[in-house]
């Protein structure tokens, strides 16, 4: 890899003599190396960028196909149709708070669709399905959304179940074990066909679920540089 990168850089007019490439044990480990200045450049996720943005910044961001709904107003997503992929490329995606078919989930959804603001008590009385604290769409950004709107985080919620995957969260949502779940904004595009047969829904997903919260954009995976690296300080 070092030789390949040197050759590509030379094609661009950069004659770099020494490149040392290592593989981090996780995105977090790479973020920590960038923060400490022991790595000059690293590949990290958007979630880790949030955690280490004081000590690193973005050089390049991956692109992905966008979806046709991007409003930060949750009610705008609830038009009776599922989200669709588009041909437009974007540098980010969003996390959504998805209400399910339980009585509590539907009550929260009805309030959002009527134009009312959800209160902290509304959200705190619901059972949430979340992912591990390192997940951007399944924990970090929904927690930031709660912080921005209510001065609270997921850790402050009274009823939280941690799932091992988005699929597990979907199953809990469909069967009423959870009232709401957090996930990436295009979760329904992929999983709507399996909502009833695989996850246990009793009607089409578009009829049984709806969005009650939308986070800020989450950067796609990126190449970031260290602000604490002596080498990068000389180059930038």
Segments and roles (model prediction):
Residues 16, 36, 44, 92-94, ...:
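Extracytoplasmic
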Residues 1-17, 144:
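Short, polar/charged alpha-helical segment
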Residues 63-136:
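A conserved helix-loop-strand patch within extracytoplasmic ligand-binding domains
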Residues 20-42, 50-55, 165-190, 194-195:
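Short helices/loops that flank or line small-molecule/ion binding pockets
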Residues 112-119, 124-234:
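Pocket-lining segment of extracytoplasmic ligand-binding domains
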Residues 57-90, 103, 159, 193-217:
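Short beta-strand->loop
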Residues 44-48, 63-65, 100-103, 133, ...:
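Solvent-exposed coil/turn segments that connect beta secondary-structure elements
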Residues 1, 18-23, 125-130:
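Short, well-ordered beta-strand elements
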